[in-house]
């Protein structure tokens, strides 16, 4: 009788604690992803504004923009690509794909004005595209891809 009562009390205590722990862990994980997305978006906006104000999309040798891209890529231990309006990669923080053409659904959507992000929970990474919009004309002159 005492063993049965003890087993029931254990089940009543352990099951709710296990459910609570599962909910807490998943909530924390989702919040961490949202913070990462917001932080990437903020840095992406800074890079986008820098690309427009320095004229980087026409002259990609500007050291201020190159150092900012490299610094943000190092902070997030990720990769940043800058694509011009001809879908040519003009900057790759890994320096592997520069000069090549990048055609992807996400980039095309960004040229239409959408900010996209893709979350791969299994491999634990976020990929984000940010349009580079010219301040005077409002025309999208490029896309930043961050992951």
For each feature predicted by the language model, list its residue ranges.
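Extracytoplasmic/periplasmic sensor domains and loops in membrane signaling proteins
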Residues: 63-67, 88-126
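Short, hydrophobic beta-strand elements of compact beta-sandwich sensory domains
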Residues: 124-147
